[in-house]
Design a protein with these regions (language model features):
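Non-heme Fe(II) oxygenase metal-center motifs and adjacent flexible, charged/small-residue loops
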Residues: 1-204
Length: 204
């Protein structure tokens, strides 16, 4: 297994390609908004979102999911429930990706104990050919992107506040991604995952 950490060039122009495929692969856009706007967005999303603590079975017990979650529809009548700040964030995403996003899922990582295990997005809940757009706010956190089959490459990247990560639909077949726990002192982070869902899909 080979691990590739990315040290970003702060003066780089345009996106950084982490993984390549015929649908755009995985591209990282650092600093799509400045620090002041990213900080304001973080505070607004944190305070205006109806966060939920989900639980899940694990072996012989039920445990808390290690993060808070929420989700909103971006279109239709259900979009009225969306905090206004999300429309502003969605417009920024649209400036970098013209996919017709229909839903946004939010994760609130309160500290280094909160995480998400390696996974790929459920392809049956996505419209093929459209990417997933991930906006990061708050403290930086490392994402691990792991190839499922040999040579099982691992790409590690610190997702900075105000950044955008685009992951192709095709990438979900071949790679998992996750946010591991960390023992280092880190502040809270919010991620917003924009997706294109089939009609009548109520997921995030």
């Amino acid at each position: 297994m080979s691990a590739v950490p990315f040290a970003l060039d702060l003066f780089a122009q345009g996106p950084i390609t982490l993984i390549d495929d015929d649908q755009g692969g995985c591209r990282y856009f650092p600093g799509v908004v400045d620090a002041a706007r990213a900080e304001a967005w973080f505070a607004a999303v944190r305070d205006q979102t109806r966060w939920s603590q989900q639980r899940r079975p694990m072996y012989d017990r039920v445990v808390d999911v290690p993060r808070l979650t929420c989700g909103y529809a971006l279109t239709g009548n259900d979009a009225d429930a969306m905090p206004p700040v999300l429309a502003d964030i969605a417009r920024t995403v649209a400036a970098h990706c013209d996919a017709p996003f229909t839903h946004v899922g939010l994760n609130y990582y309160r500290d280094g104990n909160d995480s998400v295990a390696p996974h790929n997005d459920k392809l049956t809940t996505l419209i093929e050919g459209h990417p997933i757009a991930l906006v990061s706010l708050g403290a930086p956190r490392r994402m691990d992107i792991r190839e499922k089959l040999p040579p099982r490459r691992v790409v590690r990247i610190d997702l900075e506040p105000g950044s955008l990560l685009l992951m192709s639909h095709a990438m979900q077949h071949h790679f998992d991604h996750g946010i591991p726990k960390t023992k280092h002192a880190v502040g809270p982070r919010i991620s917003l995952a924009f997706r294109v869902r089939p009609p009548k899909d109520t997921g995030w």
